[in-house]
């Protein structure tokens, strides 16, 4: 684990692409961090690229692009990665044509429909669990019934909590999965960070080798863990969920630790 600035600077020489988490890394809730623009401008000035990757499956691609635009960050579609697209690509390869029951927001359901999936409320082949801020007892009950009856069961993102303003949190997809597990005894395979399928997706989308990629985020068990056992550089920022004292008690160790991306901008 590197904290020395000169060593971080040396490590950054090989990096061509930065994959940035969003909540807790570039903004918190509705508030953009004051150093975010400086970091992004520095990345471009040093002829590197940046992409955003969010595990938050409650919104669609357009919503995230619009949110960034509203914060003064204009990006191409290819620069915005969402955990939903990781599972959609995998499902297309392995379960094309199957019928799905999506526990998710209207935006998530529309995303599945836009990619050609048939949503089935009666007898689906697959249950998909997303971060559902519109969750109801009826949805939970149906999902549990379908899972007990033998439907395949996949989760989009394993995050337990979603960070909000004023150091508050709301239950995320991982917490919902634990609720379903308590009822059915089944826990899903997840596809967002830290899944190896997400890492494969990032490498494929960027066209870079793993040793040229750095992933930046505020969560040890998703943003940092996704790089474990790979040549991808993991950079933990302390501007979101994780505090410095959490690192000592965690099995997941980042390659680099910084207070926030504003510090990293000075080392590129």
What are these regions (language model features)?
Residues 2-20, 27-45, 62-78, 88-268:
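Asp-based, Mg2+/Mn2+-dependent phosphohydrolase catalytic module
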Residues 56:
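Conserved phosphate/oxyanion-binding catalytic-loop motifs
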């Amino acid at each position: 684990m590197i904290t020395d600035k000169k060593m971080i600077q040396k490590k950054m020489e090989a990096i061509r692409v930065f994959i940035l988490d969003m909540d807790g890394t570039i903004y918190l809730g509705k508030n953009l961090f004051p150093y975010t623009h400086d970091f992004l401008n520095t990345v471009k000035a040093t002829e590197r690229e940046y992409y955003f990757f969010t595990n938050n499956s409650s919104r669609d691609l357009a919503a995230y692009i619009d949110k960034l635009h509203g914060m003064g960050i204009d990006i191409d579609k290819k620069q915005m990665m969402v955990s939903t697209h990781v599972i959609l690509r995998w499902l297309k390869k392995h379960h094309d044509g199957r019928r799905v029951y999506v526990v998710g927001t209207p935006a998530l359901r529309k995303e599945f429909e836009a990619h050609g999936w048939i949503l089935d409320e009666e007898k689906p082949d697959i249950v998909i669990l997303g971060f559902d801020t519109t969750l109801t007892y009826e949805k939970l009950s149906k999902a549990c019934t379908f899972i007990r009856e033998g439907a395949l069961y996949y989760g989009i993102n394993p995050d337990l909590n979603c960070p909000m303003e004023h150091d508050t949190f709301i239950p995320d997809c991982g917490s919902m999965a634990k609720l379903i597990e308590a009822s059915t005894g089944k826990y899903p395979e997840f596809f967002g960070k830290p899944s190896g399928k997400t890492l494969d997706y990032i490498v494929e989308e960027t066209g870079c080798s793993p040793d040229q990629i750095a992933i930046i985020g505020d969560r040890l068990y998703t943003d940092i863990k996704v790089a474990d056992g790979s040549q991808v550089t993991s950079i933990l920022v302390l501007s979101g969920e994780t505090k410095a004292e959490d690192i000592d008690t965690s099995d997941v160790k980042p390659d680099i630790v910084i207070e926030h991306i504003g510090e990293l901008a000075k080392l590129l």
